[in-house]
């Protein structure tokens, strides 16, 4: 039996986002999103640091011309990618909401599914 602490529904939606980790800008793709956060996938080949040190630290997220702050809550390795769970900081939530709304509105394929 597993206990899921998520309080909001996740949506599987790939969005290209860059993250700044320890001063290094890395490209990633969201695995799933919610109004309060995201799961970002990054190739393990791109990450040159130990991620244990970034837990509960603030990171910068970059999407097109938008810059947001988030906190790393968890990470795991899945095949050749790191999955990093990030909660969006309060001051960045209006920006994150605009990004989510834009992507959900423009997804014409109808293939957006709950994560």
Region roles according to the model:
Residues 1-35, 42-43, 100-115:
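N-terminal helix initiation/capping motif
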Residues 15-21, 53-66:
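Short conserved beta-strand and strand-loop elements enriched in small hydrophobics
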Residues 32, 74-76, 90:
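A residue-level detector for short acidic-glycine micro-motifs
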Residues 39-42, 78-89:
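Short, solvent-exposed secondary-structure boundary/capping segments
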Residues 44-55:
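Surface-exposed connector loops and short turns at secondary-structure junctions
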Residues 50, 93-102:
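A short macromolecule-binding patch
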Residues 60-80:
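Mid-chain, well-packed structural core segment of small domains
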């Amino acid at each position: 039996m597993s206990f899921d602490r998520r309080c909001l529904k996740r949506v599987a939606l790939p969005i290209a986002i860059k993250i700044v980790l320890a001063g290094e800008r890395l490209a990633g793709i969201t695995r799933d999103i919610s109004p309060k956060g995201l799961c970002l996938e990054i190739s393990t080949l791109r990450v040159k640091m130990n991620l244990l040190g970034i837990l509960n630290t603030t990171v910068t997220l970059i999407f097109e011309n938008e810059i947001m702050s988030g906190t790393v809550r968890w990470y795991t390795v899945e095949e050749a990618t790191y999955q990093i769970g990030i909660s969006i900081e309060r001051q960045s939530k209006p920006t994150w909401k605009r990004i989510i709304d834009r992507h959900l509105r423009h997804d014409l394929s109808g293939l957006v599914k709950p994560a």
